[in-house]
Amino acid sequence: MNVSATKDVYKTSRFFYILEAAFEYFISILVTGAYLAKVTEAIGISDTLTGILTAFVSLGCGFQIIAIFLANKHPVKRWVTILHSVNQLVFALIYLVPFIPLTREQKTIVFVVFLLLGHIINNIVHAPKINWFMSLVDDKKRGSFTASKEMVSLIGGMVFSFVMGFVIDEFEAAGDLNGAFAVCGISVVVLMLLHSSTLLFSKEKPCEQKEIVPTKQLLGEFIKDKNLFKVILVAVLWNVVNYSATPFYGSYQIKELGFTMTFVSVTSAAYAVIRASCSKPLGKFADKHSFVNMLNICFTIAFVSFAGNVFAVPSNGKFLFTATYMLYAVAMAGINSSTINLIYDYVDPEKRMGALALSGALSGFAGFFTTLAVSPLVTFIQENGNTFLGISMYAQQLVSAIAATLLLVLLVYLNVVVKKLKNKRKDDVAVDEMPSNGAILVDVNNKEQE
């Protein structure tokens, strides 16, 4: 028996991928949300400008499209590692801005440049990096692997956020905000070094293409591939569903439902634990029965969650909204990684990097513009005393109904269109076979996968 032929030479690299994802997530925590707000407040940036910056950052997903033109840049390890390190170093420099002896306007310009540059570079390397590491994962174990990766990031992120929050609060209590910024900046640099190490010590699988297809020809084939766009549309439609409702739930919990910050923190922790604990079982299910069947289950659970929120009001909110939030956690345990895995199920290897990039860009745009479109409706209901068409309701109840309705459309699309596509998994699993006692949604197609 040839031992060397059966040795798994990428096992360590997959372990580094799990660590890489966790370190990158920790950095993202430090350059978004409350941490970023602390910096903008210290610089003197208005809440309005902060909101605009946040919006532009979310639109940075559009730069993922650049990866389509980098499809022939193999190997990717060297330039992805360099660019990723640069983008994270730029993020660290954000915490240096309050110390720079410049005017408020000049500090604002420097801050904006650092923030946008970091996110632009991060989006450019996102798809190539994912394609690099996911190519090291056995097709029969992708669901289980991505679940393990998510579990480490979720639990690790929860602990990291708690520790960093405690440290920053201690500095603020002592009146040393500059010390807090220094700790955050140094933390990003340390995480950047750890993150870069995981990339440097990981292996890259040799390119399977015997001949390099010219970029122009590859783009032509890419655009003509209707099946590719059918798969990407799942991620786009899900973001339309998700961002039509969830961005408005935060204020609903605090204002209308009257949740305390302590209660919100407890439910957030419970969300992370439930999502992490459900990731592995759902991943194993997908490995055995296909990601489409797993999405049928997860989308159905998400539908119940959104539908339940239609009835969540102050009198029952503490129970009902919390219950639906936990259901949402279960659903997201499978949905979150499914868009990547669907691409690896149905898209040709040479087109996967471009598909990942286009999926990230289009779904990001879809989410942003959906929230933008729904926002006036929310404002209208709130300004009219929580009534709509003469019916007394909270805006969040209506957007939940909209999300639930759109999700039914997505479920039909998944079964009528995507389930017909030819699966490209390199294994002999009957990917469309699903035990009848595990079915939550009736397969409206009811046809064997080609």
What residues fall within each predicted segment?
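Loop-to-transmembrane helix entry/capping segments in MFS-fold secondary transporters
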Residues: 47, 139-149, 261-262, 349-360
